């Protein structure tokens, strides 16, 4: 077993204590962001989230048509996103519409802004 050593001469105990407290305070936020990023780590789900941000809400049939996938496949992805509290639903007659929750929209919007900026660069190149 390799012994791990640190080459620093002096530990800043105040800094270490402050960082530990900050992590403890932010633990719930870390868990929430980790959950969102884990779900968005799948390319199809990330695309669904992007489309929901752009269009505000879509039904599984619309997403299936846009992505060229079956409705059951889309529904499976939407179920995972809903179970993770990343999306919410609204029912109108027989149709269920999906949208991003407001908290998650705030978290994901900067990522989608980056995607839009990269897309614009490619279109103008």
Give the positions of each predicted feature.
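Beta-hairpin "wing" of winged helix-turn-helix
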Residues: 82-92, 99
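N-terminal leader segment of winged-helix/HTH proteins
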Residues: 1-40, 86
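Base-recognition residues in the alpha-helical recognition helix of bacterial helix-turn-helix
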Residues: 50, 76-77
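Alpha-helical residues within the helix-turn-helix
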Residues: 65, 76, 82-83
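N-terminal helix-turn-helix DNA-binding core of bacterial DNA-binding proteins
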Residues: 27-70, 96-103
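Divalent metal-coordination and catalytic microenvironments
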Residues: 41, 74, 81
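Functionally engaged cysteine thiol sites
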Residues: 58-61, 89, 117-118, 122
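Conserved segment of winged-helix/HTH DNA-binding domains
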Residues: 21, 54, 97-125
């Amino acid at each position: 077993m390799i012994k791990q050593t640190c080459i620093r001469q002096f530990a800043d105990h105040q800094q270490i204590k402050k960082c530990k407290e900050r992590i403890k305070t932010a633990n719930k936020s870390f868990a929430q962001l980790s959950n969102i990023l884990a779900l968005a780590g799948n390319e199809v789900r990330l695309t669904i989230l992007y489309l929901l941000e752009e269009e505000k809400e879509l039904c599984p049939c619309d997403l299936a048509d846009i992505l060229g996938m079956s409705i059951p496949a889309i529904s499976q992805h939407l179920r995972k996103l809903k179970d993770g509290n990343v999306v919410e639903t609204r029912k109108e007659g027989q149709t269920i519409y999906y949208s991003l929750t407001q908290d998650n929209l705030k978290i994901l919007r900067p990522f989608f802004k980056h995607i839009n900026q990269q897309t614009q660069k490619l279109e103008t190149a």
